[in-house]
Amino acid sequence: MGENTVPQKSSDNVGSIVALMVALLVAIFAFQLNASMLSPALVTMQAQLHTTASSIALTQTIFFTAAALFALFLPRLADLIGRKKVLIGMLTLTMIGCLISGFATNVGILMIGRILQGAAGPVVPLCLIILHVKVRDEKRYAKLMAILTSINGGIAGVDALAGGWLVSHGGFRSVFFVMGITAALAILLVSFGTQESTAKDTPKMDWTGVILLVVAMGALLSAVNALQGSFGNLGLPNWLLASILALLGLICFVGFWQVEKRVNHPMVPIHYLKQRRTWGLLITTLLTMTGVFAIMNGIIPALGQDGKFGLGLGADMVSLVTLTPYALAGLFFGPVSGFLAARFGFAKVLRVGLLTTIIGIVLAVAGVLQPSIWLLLLVSTFIGITYAGITNIMLNGLGIVLSPEDNPGYLPGLNAGMFNLGAGLSFIILYAVPTVLHTSVGGSSSGYISGIVTGLILVIIAFFTSFLIPDSKDCKINLE
């Protein structure tokens, strides 16, 4: 018997697994819609709320920051008080946030709503933990886990198109109401389709450690956002504000480390932080996300729209050529990578994903040298398979299967934080390097190339750090 308790009536029959998968899929949909469905509504929100583009952009920043911070501790809290209970609570807060945002009359109320919507941040790792408790066979789990995580990445692009249709027919509020309805449906399905489980040992939550870790990560994420100019209206230079926030984050992390060494039941035992299963995975996730995210969500779309050095496509056409095939390729290949992980192991498939992603990024450089719509489509589809369909799924899966028996929630939470931190760092680093070289992304072909090559170098480093990640069998993982 392992370190998780499951209901006495728990069974692995097909009907219960199908009900569980449907419930978890809709819960993940509810999070994904909050993350990406709003993109086409931003300009309309600015007009209808009589505010500025920077204020609306800040509401997006606040949502993603809140999502990252909730992900740090809610999976561990779920270990202690019940995963089903916490998932329903997260979805309830998300639904309330959607309603507040939908009825918002000014940007201040909208920000409150978006913060509450950020409670959905750890939905994916928590759903993967719930699935792992139910499905004890590692090979079967790998296949089902891949379906959940590929769906999470796969509707990006499609949901944005749906968001655009809703905005044009019902205004931005209709988008929030659809998000709220989806969250309500998820609450209903999770209530009836999942069973409660906790860790075997359920001491009190280490709230001192939680506060210090949340402030530390929040300060670091805010420092990244400050470098991007998200808080420019505070009157301080971006570099100075970022430095202050980074120092605050460092101080709080040192405090977190000291607290965790002294309390009887730490949120994250220090000996786990020192193990390769923790820092090996977190470093690889951070490097990978930093290397890939801005390429696929910034540089490649910008190249498609660039009339001088690229193809001069419209925004809608660029989405159809780059973002949508990238997402759909990940969706369709995800189950295949799950099958491969079940046969060869998560770590080996991760390395294949990273190696082929490196090849895809090299193709992206060719796309700059000889721009064509077919080459951009090929690059987007290829990296959609190798990153969204393989690498991203394996990184999420490793966060679950490498988690220790007595603390299965800490690693998925920290891993989610690295995904979010990497997304922010990606736009800073990949756009800063061309500036150092006296060019810019969009300013010349060499600007695009230097940004992409920077990402390429980071992913190459991630490939080598992936060899630091131990095999799950070496960690004696057993979540039964």
UniProtKB/Swiss-Prot annotation:
Bilayer-spanning residue ranges: 14-34, 55-75, 93-113, 115-135, 147-167, 174-194, 207-227, 239-259, 280-300, 320-340, 358-378, 382-402, 417-437, 449-469
Which GO molecular function terms does the record list?
A: transmembrane transporter activity
The record lists its disulfide bonds as none
Q: How does it sit in the membrane?
A: Multi-pass membrane protein
Effect of knocking it out? Mutant shows slower uptake of uridine. The double mutant uriP-nupA is impaired in uridine transport.
Which keywords label this protein?
Answer: Cell membrane, Membrane, Transmembrane, Transmembrane helix, Transport
List the GO cellular component terms. Answer: plasma membrane
Query: At the top level of its lineage, which domain of life is listed?
Result: Bacteria
The family database entries (Pfam families) matched by this protein are listed as: MFS_1
Record's subcellular location:
Cell membrane
Cited InterPro entries: MFS (IPR011701), MFS_dom (IPR020846), MFS_trans_sf (IPR036259)
Q: Which family does it belong to?
A: Belongs to the major facilitator superfamily. EmrB family.
Q: What does this protein do?
A: Responsible for the uptake of uridine and deoxyuridine. Not involved in purine nucleoside uptake.
Q: What is this protein called?
A: Uridine/deoxyuridine transporter
